Structures are given as C-alpha cells and as structure tokens.
Amino acid sequence: MATLLHLDTSVHPDGASVSRSVTASFREAWEAQHPDGKVIYRDLNADPIPHLQGVAAVAGFIPPQNHTPEQAAAFALRDQLATELEQADAVLIGAPMYNYTIPSTLKAWLDHVIVMGRTSGAETPSAAGKPATVVASRGGGYGPGTPRESFEFVLPYLEKVLGAEGFGLDVEFIVPELTLAETTPGMEHLVEIAKASRTQAHEAAQSRGKALAAHLAA
C-alpha cells in the first residue's frame, strides 16, 4: 500500500487557487489507483508549521539519545515531520510563487525537515530516490527568454533543497503560468496562453499521478 505525502501552501482556498486545483488533479489520479492507500496531508496555510527556533535547530545536530528534556521537546515536531517524509512513497507539493519565492509556510516546513545527517547532508539521505512532484504556479511568466526570467528563484531553490543536494528526491516540476492573466488589467492578451498553461498543468498532474501510482503498485 503506497503512501503519498501531500502539502498545499496557497493562501487561497480551494476553487480560487491554481496550485491547489492542480495538486487535486494529481491526488485524484493517484487515489483512483490506490483507493485503499494512505495520504498524509498537510495544509500549511490552514495549519502552519511554526518557524524553527534555536533549541530545535541545535537539537538537530545532537544525537537524540543525548538530548536534554528541553531539546527533546523542541525536536519532537521536527522528528514527526521528517518521519512523514520518510514514510512517504511519493511527495506532492503545491508551491505557488509569492514575491518571487516560495511561501513562507513551505520554508518553515523545510527548515524543520532538513535534519543534517538524516534527511539531508548524509551519504544517502533517508528519503533519497523517492519521486516528488512540485506544482509551482505563478501569476506571471518567468520562463527562459521572458523579460522576467532573472526573477525565477522558486525552481532553482526547490531543485537544490529537494533534489540531489538536499533530500535526494527525484523532482519533477509542473508549472502553470500567468495565473493572474484573467484578473489583472494589461494581461488580457495573455488569457488564452494562461488557459492553455493551466490545462497542460492539469493533464501533466493527472498523468504523473496515475503513472507513479501504477509504478508503485507494480
């Protein structure tokens, strides 16, 4: 029975968020293949992870058996979140671009889950090799050749922290662009391109969810 770790981070609710709708397409396809499977779901906007504090940060560099009671209590959440990543067979993350970077709630989650010598910074990180799908929606266009190409920080950062130099996950990005075109004056000429990008994102999410679920079921 495969386990999916699903994180949503959009500040917008279902129906108003492109990243949430696309992760939902992935999950629907996944669950169709694994109706009895397990999904670990965290809505980091509705139930945010607190920012990492000093005691918990230091505890990450100390063997658990040597923790003080204060360090053990502070590290408990980090251990829980890292364990959720380790238990998952696949990871799904909705990561919309906010002010040219990832949502702060996702950064807080990463700060807790990056445990050096365990999930990261180890010869073989504890979740290495697992497939991760990131829905990196954005209101504008930041692809190669666009005027704001140099403002693209989301994909390079997540590739580093989730990929070979971090958790060691096998990361694939789905990038719905121009999500603000239908509501932003001056972007009217981009509406059809935005719709096409959204359609492609849903199709990619459904295909990816189905394929990964089928592979893990084999």
What are these regions (language model features)?
Residues 1-91, 95, 100-115, 202-218:
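N-terminal beta1-alpha1-beta2 submodule of the flavodoxin-like/Rossmannoid cofactor-binding fold
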Residues 3, 38, 130-131, 170:
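Residues at the starts of beta-strands that form the adenosine-phosphate
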Residues 6, 93, 132-136, 173:
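Structural beta-sheet core signal
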Residues 10-13, 139-142, 179:
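A short, flexible beta-alpha/helix-coil linker loop
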Residues 43-50, 140, 178-181:
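Short, internal active-site loops enriched in acidic
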Residues 106-125, 135:
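Conserved nucleotide-sugar donor-interacting segment of glycosyltransferase catalytic cores
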Residues 121-168:
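Short, glycine-/small-residue-rich phosphate/pyrophosphate-handling segment
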Residues 148-152, 156-218:
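Glycine-rich phosphate/pyrophosphate-binding loop and the adjoining helix
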